[in-house]
Amino acid sequence: MWCASPVAVVAFCAGLLVSHPVLTQGQEAGGRPGADCEVCKEFLNRFYKSLIDRGVNFSLDTIEKELISFCLDTKGKENRLCYYLGATKDAATKILSEVTRPMSVHMPAMKICEKLKKLDSQICELKYEKTLDLASVDLRKMRVAELKQILHSWGEECRACAEKTDYVNLIQELAPKYAATHPKTEL
């Protein structure tokens, strides 16, 4: 029968703890790799679905051209993602091949985003703006900058607005028009 000294047992346990740390509260097993790539995953899934729906040939050149044209219509965080990928005219780097090559063999968007994260961590740091339900929020309690942002997200602008009440009145006036197309407004 083999008996280890207490020091050896403590050293062994410490080694196990370092090599396999215990998850702390709030931490998820496996780190849920896709949880932080929401913009990338959503965008690439929508892009892939559009290619499938239109019956596009999955060659590298075709996917690259389609991705660049798909990025022309993007706004906000998705436009920023296109910039990071190099699919916009003003992009500094071009890593489109890191999307087109895996997509040509029908790799899932989540796996593509994980690979992109290794190249540029900013890609997975993108998050969609929280959405605002105009029916449940009191516009009078919001800041003017937030009210301007609502109008900007609708593509509207108030040049004659001098006070906060002007912005509130304009948003309430335009809300039925945009509530039909956008049930929730980005804030």
From Swiss-Prot:
Residues 1-24 form the signal peptide. It is found in: Secreted. The keyword Nucleus does not apply. Induction: Not induced by endoplasmic reticulum stress. The keyword Signal applies. InterPro entries: ARMET-like, ARMET_C, ARMET_N, SAP_dom_sf. One of its GO terms (cellular component) is endoplasmic reticulum. Pfam families: ARMET_C (PF10208), ARMET_N (PF20145). GO terms for molecular function: growth factor activity. Its main location: secreted. Disulfide bonds join C37-C124, C40-C113, C71-C82. One of its GO terms (biological process) is dopaminergic neuron differentiation. It comes from the Eukaryota. Keywords: Disulfide bond, Growth factor, Secreted, Signal. This is Cerebral dopamine neurotrophic factor. It comes from Homo sapiens. The lineage of its organism: Eukaryota, Metazoa, Chordata, Craniata, Vertebrata.
